């Protein structure tokens, strides 16, 4: 008898133990007695929303760095000006880009299993805010990549900053590999910048996300040192890869500071509201009390 009413309702809810017809007509089917399952569904949906926001920010930030960097490096950088034997335009082999993409996909998938907090109030999509935050992260990574490319190309000049720091001169193939490693690491570190509004250490990541990060960064570093695919790229030394790691970590902190500043400015001008999160311990007690309430 309830099936027609459930079908006409905006949100039809069938309780645990309802008939098959009622469950088929309902939009939501409670799988346990009481109202606690409704609370669980709301909290879970808000956590999914948070993970989707983090995914979008991370994906856009990585894409901005990758696409804009190769556009700028191909158009405005001419390696032949630094060494006549080098090509006129800077480029990285397709196999390197494919490797970055494949390893990055694993990190992206892990975002779906990250630790997040459900918000106290319902949230809605604001693509403008997501794009602004993504750009703050992605363009900072872009600037660091362009700066490293400029310094690496000038490594053959004894008077350059690179040489004055005591770093060795590099061949063109080594420069390609160094840039490959830098972009890879920047992308993987950006996942920690994208997942919080505050500093990246304000909320612990999930084991799955950390595991994906370790695998991706480890594989990228090994490939950079023992580059097996040829195509003009040459493996770099462990020392140089260590310097690249240090460079990326410093810029990752700068990225995070830029993100925190961006959110602060957006909150100050009223574009972003300060959202409180649900206390998981109090929620559990509340859900247990609702579990004792039977729904007729």
PLM region descriptions:
Residues 1-9:
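Acidic, divalent-metal-coordinating active-site segment for phosphoryl/phosphodiester hydrolysis
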Residues 62, 100, 153-296:
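C-terminal transmembrane module of polytopic membrane proteins
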């Amino acid at each position: 008898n309830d099936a027609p009413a459930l079908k006409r309702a905006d949100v039809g809810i069938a309780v645990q133990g309802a008939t098959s017809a009622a469950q088929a007509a309902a939009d939501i089917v409670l799988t346990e007695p009481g109202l606690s399952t409704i609370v669980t569904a709301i909290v879970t949906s808000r956590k999914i929303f948070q993970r989707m926001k983090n995914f979008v920010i991370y994906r856009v930030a990585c894409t901005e760095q990758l696409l804009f960097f190769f556009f700028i490096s191909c158009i405005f950088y001419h390696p032949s000006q630094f060494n006549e034997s080098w090509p006129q335009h800077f480029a990285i082999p397709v196999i390197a880009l494919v490797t970055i993409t494949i390893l990055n996909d694993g990190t992206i998938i892990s975002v779906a299993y990250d630790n997040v907090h459900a918000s106290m109030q319902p949230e809605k999509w604001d693509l403008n805010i997501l794009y602004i935050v993504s750009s703050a992260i992605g363009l900072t990574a872009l600037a660091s990549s362009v700066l490293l490319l400029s310094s690496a190309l000038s490594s053959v000049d004894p008077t350059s900053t690179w040489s004055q720091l005591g770093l060795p001169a590099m061949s063109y193939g080594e420069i390609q590999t160094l840039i490959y490693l830098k972009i890879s690491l920047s992308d993987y570190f950006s996942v920690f910048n994208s997942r919080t509004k505050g500093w990246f250490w304000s909320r612990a990541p999930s084991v799955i996300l950390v595991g994906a990060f370790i695998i991706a960064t480890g594989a990228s570093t090994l490939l950079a040192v023992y580059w097996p695919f040829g195509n003009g790229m040459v493996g770099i030394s462990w020392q140089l890869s260590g310097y690249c790691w240090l460079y990326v970590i410093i810029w990752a902190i700068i990225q995070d500071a830029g993100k925190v500043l961006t959110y602060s400015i957006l909150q100050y001008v009223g574009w972003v509201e300060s959202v409180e999160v649900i206390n998981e311990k109090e929620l559990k007690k509340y859900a247990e009390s609702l579990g004792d309430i039977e729904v007729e």
